[in-house]
Amino acid sequence: MAMEGKSRRFAVACGVLSQYVRAEQKMAAAAGAAPARAVTTLSLMPGAEVVVEEEERREVGEEEAGPATAPAAPLTIFYGGRMVVFEDFPADKAAEVMRMASSGMAAAPAQREGAALADMPIMRKASLQRFFAKRKDRLAATTPYARPSPAETKASEPEEKKTPTSWLDLAASASAAARRDSLTIAL
């Protein structure tokens, strides 16, 4: 259910972004060609040092040559396992979208990591319970082949003691019973 909420939020965000882009393109077309801002490099790694001298030289050279329009190129957004592509997306708008995305990203990962860490022991416990439930028969068996337990062998010994231990005793008891049962006639 949580996955549905994320995908729905993503779809809504993409729809809003698409509407914004269309509105901006219509306004830009209606207002005419406005001078484009200089293209700047976005820092994707906030802690890294960036050498800006070469970029400044390029910008100065471009300003002297005259204002250049920002080329339109496709914009591809990967989010939540999905990919959204916008055709002919202006570079300045792409920079604005990147700025907006980076400002909103600061608080979101901290919340997700905290929730994930809180769920880990519960998930681990549930996983172990499933594992043990599937293998409880294996855990109960001490060896791969069943051996009679000592309690079972002791219980069967008294039955063996009741029977005669010698074959001679068996013959003697059989002959005594035969003598009793036989009919003797004396004349």
Curated annotation (Swiss-Prot):
It is found in: Nucleus. InterPro entries: CCT_CS, TIFY/JAZ, Tify_dom. Coiled coil: none annotated. GO terms for cellular component: nucleus. Residues 68-103 form the Tify domain. GO terms for biological process: regulation of defense response; regulation of jasmonic acid mediated signaling pathway; response to wounding. It holds the Pfam family Jas_motif. Residues 139-168 are annotated as: Disordered. A motif (Jas) lies at residues 121-145. A motif (Nuclear localization signal) lies at residues 123-130. Residues 154-163 have a biased composition (Basic and acidic residues). Keywords: Jasmonic acid signaling pathway, Nucleus, Transcription, Transcription regulation, Ubl conjugation. Ubiquitinated. Targeted for degradation by the SCF(COI1) E3 ubiquitin ligase-proteasome pathway during jasmonate signaling. Its main location: nucleus. Induction: By jasmonate, wounding, and cold, drought and salt stresses. Down-regulated by abscisic acid (ABA). PROSITE patterns: TIFY. Interacts with COI1B in a coronatine-dependent manner. Coronatine is an analog of jasmonoyl isoleucine (JA-Ile). The jas domain (121-145) is required for interaction with COI1. Belongs to the TIFY/JAZ family. Repressor of jasmonate responses. This is Protein TIFY 11b. It comes from Oryza sativa subsp. japonica.
